């Protein structure tokens, strides 16, 4: 199993106070962090607030609400898929929720990951999507699974990459 370090989370994590970044490319879906003073250079000693070792492999972006950061992650072989909650200020892992266990993971190209889609936060739920392996809604505070759907089967060719969005209520 490979260790992936969260060295540089999106610019929303650099800001001094927790923000609301609920989906891929932010609250408006346009990637605008609403701050022209954001750093553009990073290193181990420059503009890095924290880093946390996270075993697994994932390309998804983090989402943020109420001082908590949510990410998705998966074993490199695709047999287990998680939602992970981290503390905004310290990077400490608060929750690691096993969302899906798969008997036969679909092929994933080595340049991709089983946890590529970014989660989305709406209200008091965080939605995680792993393509053909399933979609689930978790309670934002407890991490408990509210519902799951595993009936959408398709051949992603290299694995799922599209991030979910919410539409109305």
Q: What is the predicted function of each stretch?
A:
Residues 1-7:
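Sec-dependent signal peptide recognition
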Residues 8-16:
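Hydrophobic h-region of N-terminal signal peptides that target proteins for export
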């Amino acid at each position: 199993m490979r260790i992936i370090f969260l060295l540089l989370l999106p610019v929303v994590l650099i800001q001094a106070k927790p923000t609301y970044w609920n989906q891929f490319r932010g609250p408006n879906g346009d990637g605008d962090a609403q701050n022209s003073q954001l750093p553009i250079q990073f290193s181990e000693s420059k503009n890095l607030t924290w880093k946390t070792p996270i075993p697994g492999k994932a390309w998804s972006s983090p989402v943020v609400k109420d001082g908590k950061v949510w990410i998705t992650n998966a074993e490199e072989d695709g047999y287990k898929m998680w939602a992970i909650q981290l503390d905004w200020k310290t990077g400490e892992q608060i929750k690691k929720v096993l969302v899906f266990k798969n008997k036969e993971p679909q092929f994933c190209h080595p340049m991709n990951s089983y946890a590529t889609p970014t989660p989305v936060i709406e209200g008091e739920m965080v939605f995680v999507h792993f393509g053909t392996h399933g979609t689930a809604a978790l309670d934002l505070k407890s991490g408990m699974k509210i519902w799951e759907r595993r009936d959408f089967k398709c051949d992603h060719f290299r694995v799922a990459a599209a991030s979910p969005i919410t539409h109305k209520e």
